[in-house]
Amino acid sequence: MAWKPRRDATEAFDPLCYYLPPDAISIETAISRVVYVNGCYMPEDEAQISIFDRGFLFGDAIYEVCLVIRGQLIDNQGHLRRLTRSLGEVDIEAPLSMDEIVSVQRELIAKNDLDEGLVYLQ
């Protein structure tokens, strides 16, 4: 599967912005079946968030969507830098260290047997 620079008549060329062909990721592989919530791995249908959660009450949230190809996170260091910067901008403390976040990402990839898809951090 080849990465191609995104470029069409309506947008300027940005060498750091890429897209995958439409058939590269199917909906089935993009949806996780095992999630990580509040320190626990669980089936997605068991995941719950407290009604007192600040993100739920006030909409405070930072997220990153990380691409997985052949079971590997693509440009994960870039995602982690942006995550760190974004958390700092809104004064939210990271619940885990960056090394722990990477461990969770890798465990989610393994638990979901994810070859191609997405890992969504929020």
Over which residues does each language-model region extend?
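Conserved alpha/beta cores of soluble small-molecule-handling proteins
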Residues: 2-122
